[in-house]
Amino acid sequence: MDPCECSKSGNCNCGGSCTCTNCSCKSCKKSCCPCCPSGCTKCASGCVCIGKTCDTSCCQ
C-alpha cells in the first residue's frame, strides 16, 4: 500500500526521498507518490520521478 497520504491531504513526504505537493510529484528516488507529473506514465507500483521527467525506464 502506498505510504503517502497525498490523495487525502494533497501533501506527503516519504523518508526524505520524495515530496508530493498538491498531488504533484516534485522529486522521487523511489516509488512513493500516488500521483505523477504530466507526461509521466503511472505504474502499478506508483511513479518514480527523477527531477521533473519520467519515462518507462524510471518505473519500477
Curated annotation (Swiss-Prot):
UniProt cross-references to Gene3D superfamilies, sorted A to Z: Metallothionein Isoform II (4.10.10.10)
Xref: Pfam families: Metallothio (PF00131)
Residue segments, region Alpha: 29-60
Residues where a divalent metal cation 2 binds: 6, 12, 14, 25
InterPro entries from the UniProt entry: Metalthion_dom_sf, Metalthion_dom_sf_vert, Metalthion_vert, Metalthion_vert_metal_BS
TM ranges: none
UniProt-annotated binding residues for a divalent metal cation 5: 33, 35-36, 49
Region (Beta), start-end ranges: 1-28
PROSITE patterns the UniProt entry points to: METALLOTHIONEIN_VRT
Record flagged with keyword Metal-binding: yes
Binding annotation for a divalent metal cation 3: 14, 18, 23, 28
Binding locations of a divalent metal cation 1: 4, 6, 20, 23
Stated role: Metallothioneins have a high content of cysteine residues that bind various heavy metals.
Record's comment describing the protein's domains: Class I metallothioneins contain 2 metal-binding domains: four divalent ions are chelated within cluster A of the alpha domain and are coordinated via cysteinyl thiolate bridges to 11 cysteine ligands. Cluster B, the corresponding region within the beta domain, can ligate three divalent ions to 9 cysteines.
Family: Belongs to the metallothionein superfamily. Type 1 family.
Name the UniProt record assigns to this protein: Metallothionein A
Organism: Chaenocephalus aceratus
